[in-house]
């Protein structure tokens, strides 16, 4: 069973430990998506008891094209390698091969050394900042964004009304304006957001929307930048010809 620890649309933290316990009771293997959680909160894979947990490099300010997969050793040892290249074998014979032990058997071919160095640097940077500071700062920014955007009558914030349940993400829609238009207008004002279905179409269908605009806060953002987002959003309907 695959489940995101933190939703990349709503920012809500799913009860992964409880989900894992329920899945294990019926013999299911749990693959957790930590791409949205690992950069923003402490993650203890042993406490969560997830069988696998994956996260990407670029979402924690590392390079693109690299990520990490944690897996319980007993499961990794049972799995065949999905890719065959150099460095992932122990020995090769005319009638077969012996694969290298975990984790080498999953590291086929030339490794992305530059990406690994960059990812390690990003992880060290987050550890130096500390998650107490990161979570406090992101909560302050998220609360500011939700209060400002929520005060606009034509803006609808997806998910919980509690900023603590958003993990630095505020996804919203604007009456009468497609999220792609919202994104283009904000981009022209020097504000970067994401628009679309965020690779989560079933969730958006459940929420009754086809797409949304997602503003993502990181600890390095400033209150002034959040205010600029709110100000720009407040002008969008007028700039689209609605007269507001």
Would you name each region that the model predicts?
Residues 1-244:
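Pyridoxal 5′-phosphate
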